[in-house]
């Protein structure tokens, strides 16, 4: 079985995600749903998130439920754990 941790964040919250990510563990991956509000200009992706076990998907607009649903749509593991930044 595989576990995917779905992390929802918005705008500059992407810069704090590395505090939630553990060292690589076999069978565990992370999907980060990075929401951009209308007035946000995306920044460079933090280098600490550029790993094989981390996938980042983006979403325009606002709304936590919308962001969570977006993460679920992109999830692929047997078990998913949804969390916010």
Describe each PLM feature range.
Residues 60, 83-84:
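Catalytic metal- and UDP-sugar-binding loop of GT-A-like glycosyltransferases, i.e.
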Residues 10-11, 46-51, 84:
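Anionic, Ser/Thr-rich low-complexity intrinsically disordered regions
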Residues 3-26, 40-43:
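Short, well-formed alpha-helical segments that are part of the catalytic scaffolds
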Residues 11, 34-40, 62:
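Conserved short acidic donor-positioning loop in nucleotide-sugar-dependent glycosyltransferases
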Residues 27-31, 45-58:
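Active-site regions of enzymes building and remodeling cell-envelope glycoconjugates
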Residues 80:
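Short aromatic/hydrophobic "clamp" motif used to bind/position activated sugar donors
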């Amino acid at each position: 079985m595989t576990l995917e941790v779905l992390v929802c964040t918005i705008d500059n919250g992407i810069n704090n995600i590395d505090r939630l990510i553990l060292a690589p563990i076999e069978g565990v991956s992370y999907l980060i749903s990075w929401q951009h509000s209308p007035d946000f200009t995306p920044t460079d992706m933090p280098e600490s998130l550029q790993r094989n076990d981390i996938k980042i998907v983006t979403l325009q607009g606002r709304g936590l439920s919308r962001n969570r649903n977006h993460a679920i749509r992109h999830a692929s593991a047997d078990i998913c754990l949804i969390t916010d930044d």
